[in-house]
Amino acid sequence: MNLNELRDNEGSRYRKKRLGRGIGSGKGKTSGRGVKGQKAREGVSLNGFEGGQLPLYRRMPKRGFVNIFRKEYAPVNLGAISKAIESGKLDKAATVNEEALRKAGLVNGSKLAGVRLLAHGELSHGVTIEVAGASAAALAAVEKAGGTVKVLETKKEAQADA
């Protein structure tokens, strides 16, 4: 048997039945929806309803919660900073902080707690970076390139120290 000899089984494919086209069509008048009621109406499907069987969302246990105090940090990779310096969007002599990263287009979004520095990519310039957080690998990579990273304290940490 070859690929060009493959065929569907006889009778396995049907033409779709057009609905509401007379009694002789087999799907006329009510189009297989029965008579009246909620399910006969247009646009109705009961999400999560499984015909009286206990639905999945009730069978599963409740777990977890949403932390309303969760802080969202914008990730910025070293490779992106390096590329921005080479293209002239960032000045390697100046301190690279959140404001500079926003102007360069590397960070956007208003509800962020700050910037987190990550180590993806190579940093070819010794720069001073001020961020809210940084990975250990990113800190090592910046220091290896001859730069420094200052991890800023949050307001809560500053109050705890005082």
Swiss-Prot record:
It comes from the Bacteria. Keywords: Ribonucleoprotein, Ribosomal protein, RNA-binding, rRNA-binding. GO terms for cellular component: cytosolic large ribosomal subunit. Pfam families: Ribosomal_L27A. One of its GO terms (biological process) is translation. NCBIfam families: rplO_bact (TIGR01071). This is Large ribosomal subunit protein uL15. The gene is rplO.
